A protein has these predicted regions:
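Membrane-interface helix-loop junctions in multi-pass transporters/channels
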Residues: 1-124
Length: 124
């Protein structure tokens, strides 16, 4: 139960930070480009890399991974987990697997979004 609470608390913080960052970028740059989404994805990727480096050195343990990696970064951006998956594949020398995963994730997510929209429009 303690692990779940760490993830939930981190998720609340990450989601709140994403909301505030999105509002700030909207006010600063306007609605013409998704600067907020791009920003959280880039920040999340950097933060995930920093966290993994700390974890690999043994400077933090499982509670930090759950709170920060799964919780905060999961709430801030799921793109950070995706980026970590791709990096791990590349480090294992699985270039084609990584490229396939990137294509399937990005294209598949957009296709799934349109499928969801289509379903909802047909029942509206």
């Amino acid at each position: 139960m303690g692990n779940l609470l760490l993830v939930m608390a981190g998720g609340a913080l990450g989601s709140g930070a994403r909301h505030l960052f999105g509002r700030w970028t909207l006010a600063a740059f306007g609605p013409d480009y998704p600067y907020g989404t791009l920003g959280v994805n880039l920040i999340g990727g950097l933060a995930m890399g920093l966290l993994v480096g700390v974890l690999l050195r043994g400077e933090a343990g499982e509670p930090a991974r759950l709170l920060l990696g799964v919780g905060v970064l999961g709430g801030f951006t799921t793109f950070s987990a995706f980026s970590l998956d791709v990096a791990l594949m590349l480090e294992r020398g699985e270039l084609l697997v990584a490229l396939g995963y990137v294509a399937a994730s990005v294209i598949g997510s957009v296709v799934a979004l349109f499928a969801g929209l289509s379903i909802m429009r047909s029942v509206a």
